[in-house]
Each structure stands twice: as C-alpha cells, then as structure tokens.
Amino acid sequence: VTRAIRPPVYKTGALGLAAALILSACSNQPAATDPAAAAGYPVTVENCGDEITFDAAPQRLMLLKSASVPALHELGVLDRAVARAGAFPQAYFDDATLAELDDIAQLTSDVDATGHLQISREVVIAQEPDLVFGEVENLSRNSLAQVDINLLEEPAFCSTSPDTKPDFESIYDQLRLYGKVFDKPDEAETYITELQDRVAAAQADVAENENRTAAVLYPTVGGGTTYAYGTGSMAHPQLEAAGFTNVFENTSERVFEVSSEQLLGLDPDIIILLHTDGDPADVENALRDLPGASDLTAVKNDQVMTQLLNFTEPATPLSVTGLEHIVEEFQP
C-alpha cells in the first residue's frame, strides 16, 4: 500500500476563507426562534477537551459517522437530522432506526479503504446544520466554529484529548452528554439502564472457567497493513466482559500495526475481525492470506469471527450489541 492509515482515526484540517464567506450571510439559529426550545439553555459540555456551548437544543443535525445514530434514535432526536454522509451499514440498526435513516438525505457514501469519509467542506456547510456528528479530515471543530456550527465526536475518535481508557461507563457518560445537549436526561437514563441490563445478561452467559485468549484485528482487504487493538480501545473491555484475555493487554495504544510474526508469537485462541463495510468473507480472507496464518490456533480451530467496526469501536451502544455477538458466537 502507498500509505498506512489507521482505521477510524481522523485528522483535522483548516477551513478555507472562501468556504466561510459562502455562509457569512447565513445565520442559522433555528432553535433560537422558539422560546420553549431555549428553556434551560445555554448548556455547556466538554468534548475532546473543548468546552462547547449550546444556546438551544440543536434542530438541524448532520451525520458524518454512524456511531451516534442509535443514541440519537433512543433520545428521540434522530428525525432532526437533515443530511448524512458516509457508511451506514443496515446491520447496525433496528427497523425503526432504519426507517428514520431512510428519511435522511444521504449526500455521499464515498469512503476509502479504511473507512474515511470523502466529502467537501462546502457540501456540509451548505446543509446549514447547527450540530455535526463526527470529525473528518477537512472539517475540524475549529473550522466549523468559524461559521457557528458545533461539532460532537465520540471520545475515542477525538483528534485531541481522546479517551485512552474507554469502557462501558464511557458509553453511559456519552449518553448523558447527549441527554444534556438535547434536554433529554430522562430518556438517556432509561436507555443507560437498558444497556446495563444487557451487559449483565451477556456476562452471565460467560463460562466460569473461561481462560481463552483473543485478539481484535482490522485487516486491509486486498493486502496491506493489519491493525490490532490494545487497551486504549473499546475492544479491550469488550473482550474482558466476554471472559477473554486480550493478547495485546500490554499495549496501551488504541490501534496499531501488527506483523504476521507478532500475531503468530501471541497466537490467540480467538480472533475477531473488524471492517467498515463490504463482504465479511473478504475480511476473513485478508486474515487467511497473511504469511503463516494457517498456523494460528484461531484459524486452525475455526475460531474467527467478523463483525462491523462500530460493534466494537468506539464506545457506543453498538459496543453492547457487539459484546452480545461475541458471547453468542464463542460461549456455550
């Protein structure tokens, strides 16, 4: 490959002056016209090390990543999304959420091999959102702030001050943040209780004498870099909750390159493969095509599972569903 891009790590970029001028005459503050909507505001939350203030509950949402969708649906605010861009695999969502997504205009689904969205600044700004979910390379928080648009990112994906020790509590904390932003605290707490019950139920299905090791990998389909997930990722607490020992438990990075030799040396009993979109069989073939892969215990014993990235990363309600998938696949 000509470049090594870590899956779901996003870099910031500056907003050009021309793009700012396009919107200079457009003051988009739909919520401010509704006195009821502004009750209890302004509110300030911390995200990616920055303090972000909302003068009213956001009314025009732009989705640049799929991770926040389940939370927005459960809070009853997904219908405020005016546009979306990127990959929104149907497997992530229930029928009710899919119905809401179908009503949201999709501007583009173009992503590169590592899941990075390809979209222009002008296209996003033209939607006149008051809140964008997800940071991409050419749309940083600061660049959007120049045209009075707020941005929220999942803590693990922050380009600055990322969450380096995510766990299931991180999921609940982010839901409370969304509840505060949208003035939906009761809905957030109800959803948190549901998720806590689901985590407890999954853990109850783990065998008491479970002692297997596991690795979570992100292979590059078609050949190239293979990435692994350490303790700085949600993969680590997810494996622990499923009863497994992460073979990369001594690596504090979230995601990092791993060689075939390293993988063979650690030889996990179970391998979980992550991907952004496409055919799971291609992802598994990318693992099997690695030099020496046929000697891996997980491969020899057919203990390999493939699931979509957001079922593990970042720490969102989808990580709970991913835990359920893992327990269902590997526990008796």
Per-region residue spans from a language model:
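Solvent-exposed, polar/charged alpha-helical surfaces in well-ordered, non-transmembrane soluble domains
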Residues: 70-73, 122-126, 142-145, 169-176, ...
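Short helix-initiation/N-cap motifs at beta->coil->alpha
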Residues: 47-49, 106-121, 251-260
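Alpha-helical, coiled-coil/dimerization segments enriched in small aliphatic residues
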Residues: 227-256
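Bacterial Sec-exported substrate-binding components of ABC uptake systems
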Residues: 2-74, 181-217, 267, 275, ...
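A short, structured surface patch at a secondary-structure boundary
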Residues: 65, 69-123, 154
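Extracytoplasmic ligand-binding site segments that recognize negatively charged/polar headgroups
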Residues: 90-93, 139-145, 149-177, 211-234, ...
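Proline-aspartate-enriched helix->loop->beta-strand connector
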Residues: 113, 120-134, 260-273
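Structured C-terminal subdomain patch of bacterial secreted/periplasmic proteins
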Residues: 165-176, 180-182, 189, 270-332
